[in-house]
Design a protein with these regions (language model features):
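Acidic, polar-rich low-complexity tracts and alpha-helical solenoid repeat scaffolds
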Residues: 1-255
């Protein structure tokens, strides 16, 4: 209807000029006046996004808006994404325990959802944060990340991220040799396959670089300087993030 369109146009205008308070209020009002309209869940979702853009002090309010969407429109496709955003906001607020529950509910409630891997990886992030230096907790995270890499059709960028975090959990729990194996296999998966290396996005290249720099560090600590140098030179050759760090480390090894 014309009335509905007017709300959408008004909110878009406010958002365009950076008036996120008015944009949020307009979208919230649309959802309140037309709760049965198919656009109502989208309006709440966008209201929460505008709220988030207002700054960290408004994250709790954004969490409530995402929760309202999930509570009122449990069968809407946006339900899953609202819960993901809710979990992400809770993490940003350092409420890792609360965020973990949100992700676990998504994993258990929607085991075949196409975005399950995001919930899985996000849960692992929460568990890593909560584990601290607890070996049992870190071991649990390592198992979850290992299983995550077995999920079908896992995007390449997420493969690189999951592998790096798996190795990080192993290193923190003292399993250096296993971590070295994970890092080596991850590097080989991408560097050894030119097509995969090219297909990596910016995030994937970042996580691959972290893996390779970490692998180089382990080799250095084990006095295997030839392998460390080889890994660093691959970082340089593929122009990965942290290239300057790799150059510096190669220079130090050669001195």
């Amino acid at each position: 209807t014309a009335a509905l369109r007017s709300y959408l146009i008004e909110a878009a205008y406010h958002g365009l000029i950076g008036d996120f308070v008015s944009a949020q209020a307009t979208m919230t009002k649309l959802a309140e006046i037309y709760p049965q309209n198919p656009l109502a869940p989208q309006a709440l979702f966008e209201a929460a996004l505008y709220c988030e853009r207002r700054g960290a002090e408004f994250y709790p309010q954004a969490v409530v808006l995402h929760n309202d969407l999930a509570t009122q429109y449990g069968t809407d496709p946006l339900f899953y994404y609202a819960r993901l955003k809710q979990g992400n906001l809770l993490r940003s607020m350092n409420n890792f325990a609360g965020a973990q529950i949100v992700y676990e509910n998504l994993i258990n409630g929607f085991p075949t959802h196409e975005m399950r891997y995001i919930a899985e990886l996000s849960r692992a992030d929460c568990m890593l944060a909560l584990a601290g230096n607890d070996f049992d907790g870190l071991a649990d995270v390592a198992v979850i990340l290992e299983r995550l890499l077995d999920l079908p059709n896992l995007p390449l960028d997420f493969q690189a991220e999951a592998a790096q975090k798996w190795a990080f959990a192993l290193i923190k729990s003292g399993s250096i040799e296993k971590a070295k194996e994970v890092l080596w296999l991850s590097a080989d998966r991408f560097i050894g396959d030119g097509e995969k290396a090219v297909a990596l996005g910016a995030a994937g290249r970042y996580w691959l670089a972290r893996s390779m720099l970490q692998l180089g560090e382990i080799f250095e600590e084990q006095d295997n300087l030839a392998e460390a140098r080889k890994v660093y030179r691959q970082v340089i050759a593929y122009n990965l993030p942290g290239r300057h760090i790799a150059i510096s480390r190669v220079d130090q090894i050669l001195e």
